């Protein structure tokens, strides 16, 4: 167990989401003081589970600067998970995608600048690599964005790295295909796994697009959460950093199906 500093108060944006819930629970278990901002109603079961564990919960939108200020009051660190995460939705409505991701992140930056935030951890995405065929992917290969979602994530990275005060540590984490307990089959994080499980348990055959030879790098949400917790706890982090959050192990869709069944 990582022992947190009880005086270290963390604002988790998107804390009621798939990764956010696991992170908030881990932080609370390690004695961090946690504040959450999410558009999910405080009466929702996911929000209630966090409230019952001791999180300060704020039903708000990161696009509203006053909501960010209220949720972040007294916090020294920020984990910015809140985002529009659907690639198809970003193509269908790029303006909304940018409004949530870009304007929301600008509000986080403004809040950090005005409140002496020590450290910001940002959830980016492997989507910023586009169709780059270099394996393994290196952080410097990013920028070949193929969707408004990817473009917005890459722009958020640039904004965070360029607009934060030098005293604030910025850690950009490019998540690959995150999976784990509590994942919705309709989610945007490696949804193939819960989709397979859902169809199998309901007596249906899993749907495979193509010949199933396409591969992905899957990483457990527990590993993602442990990494973020360590970054928050470590006072010797480098000033800024951009990191791939993956396992460097490729698993084909066919192999994944064999593992699940």
Q: How would you name each of these model-derived features?
A:
Residues 2-77:
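N-terminal Rossmann/SDR dinucleotide-binding element
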Residues 13, 75-81, 122, 244:
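Rossmann-fold scaffold of SDR-type NAD(P)-dependent oxidoreductases
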Residues 23, 160, 228-232, 257-260:
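Hydrophobic "lid"/C-terminal helical patch
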Residues 62-99:
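NAD(P)H-binding glycine-rich loop region in Rossmannoid oxidoreductase-like domains
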Residues 67, 107-110, 159, 218, ...:
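Conserved mid-core alpha-helix of short-chain dehydrogenase/reductase
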Residues 92-110, 114, 118-119, 128-179, ...:
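Catalytic helix-loop patch of NAD(P)-dependent Rossmann-fold dehydrogenases
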Residues 154, 178-194, 202-205, 209, ...:
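Glycine/proline-rich active-site loop of Rossmann-fold NAD(P)-dependent oxidoreductases
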């Amino acid at each position: 167990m990582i022992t947190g500093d009880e005086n270290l108060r963390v604002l988790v944006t998107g804390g009621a989401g798939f990764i956010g819930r696991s992170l908030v629970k881990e932080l609370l278990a390690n004695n961090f003081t946690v504040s959450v901002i999410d558009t999910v109603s405080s009466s929702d079961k996911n929000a209630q589970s966090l409230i019952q564990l001791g999180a300060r919960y704020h039903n708000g939108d990161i696009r509203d600067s006053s909501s960010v200020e209220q949720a972040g009051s007294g916090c020294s660190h920020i984990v910015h998970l809140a985002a529009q995460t659907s690639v198809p939705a970003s193509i269908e409505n790029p303006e909304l995608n940018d409004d949530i991701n870009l304007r929301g992140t600008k509000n986080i930056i403004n809040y950090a600048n005005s409140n002496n935030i020590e450290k910001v951890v940002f959830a980016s995405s492997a989507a910023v690599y586009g169709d780059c065929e270099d394996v393994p992917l290196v952080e410097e290969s990013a920028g070949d964005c193929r969707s408004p979602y990817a473009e917005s994530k890459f722009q958020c990275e640039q904004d965070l790295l360029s607009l934060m005060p030098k005293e604030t540590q910025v850690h950009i984490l490019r998540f690959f295909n995150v999976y784990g307990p509590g994942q919705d089959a309709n989610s945007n994080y490696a949804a193939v796994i819960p989709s397979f499980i859902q169809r199998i348990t309901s007596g249906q055959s899993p749907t495979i697009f193509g010949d199933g030879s396409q591969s992905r790098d899957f990483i457990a949400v527990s590993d993602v959460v442990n990494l973020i917790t360590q970054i928050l706890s470590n006072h010797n982090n480098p000033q800024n950093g951009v990191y791939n959050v993956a396992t460097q192990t490729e698993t084909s869709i066919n192999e994944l199906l064999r593992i699940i069944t």
